Every structure is written in structure tokens, then in C-alpha cells.
């Protein structure tokens, strides 16, 4: 069976892994998933990530905890295949009053809402992370 929304699957695996206190989660890899993982690592939401395998690459995300609590409290898909959500740079959302991030797909690549606002770019809102 083919996967209809691989990004939602990735976010669900991370959410479920954190709920079950897993050390790491594995999933099929893609360029967009690796870019999202790199952004989450840069923002401090995950400990590390690695791509393993050549024929069928797998993305392994090492989850992060602080004092035995999840670092990611909320991770939510916004734009989905049935309803794409685009915003201009002046209408980009602020997640939890700036405590969280919105992952934005812009013409210059994937970036957080703060970086997109600073660069004056809008784009597709992939997900919210807090």
C-alpha cells in the first residue's frame, strides 16, 4: 500500500516515539524529510539524525529528552495533500507566542518562521513544533 502523506507519517512516528520514550525512530528517507530533520536539529528539538542505506535509504532520528520529559510537546501537520496552506511573510504564524516554530517551505528552502520573516519570504506551512 502506498503512503499518501509521508510527512504526516514522519511527524506521527516522532510523536509516537516520544510518547513511548524511545531513543530513536526509523522511517523511509526523502530529501524533504532530511531537510525537516536538519531544521529540527538546528532548533534543538531532536538530538541527531542519520541516513542509512543506499538502495532503500532510512532516516533515523535520535529523540531528545530533558529531565526525563519530551522536548517536543506538540508536533502538528498544517499543510497536507488535500489542503495546502500558504502564507505571505507578513502573515506567517507565531507558534506559542514565539516559543515554538513553524516549518516553512520557501523558494530558498526549508526554514523556521523566524528565519522566513527575517528574510522576507512566505511559503507553504509544513508543520508546527513546540
Curated annotation (Swiss-Prot):
Alphabetical UniProt keywords: Ribonucleoprotein, Ribosomal protein, RNA-binding, rRNA-binding
Pfam short name (any one): Ribosomal_S8
InterPro entries: Ribosomal_uS8, Ribosomal_uS8_CS, Ribosomal_uS8_sf
One MF annotation (Gene Ontology) recorded for this entry: structural constituent of ribosome
GO biological process: translation
Cellular component aspect of the GO annotation: ribonucleoprotein complex; ribosome
Keyword rRNA-binding tagged: yes
Transmembrane segments: none
Superkingdom of this protein's organism: Bacteria
Subunit structure: Part of the 30S ribosomal subunit. Contacts proteins S5 and S12.
Protein family (similarity comment): Belongs to the universal ribosomal protein uS8 family.
Job of this protein: One of the primary rRNA binding proteins, it binds directly to 16S rRNA central domain where it helps coordinate assembly of the platform of the 30S subunit.
NCBIfam families (UniProt xref): PRK00136.1
Name of the protein in its database record: Small ribosomal subunit protein uS8
Gene: rpsH
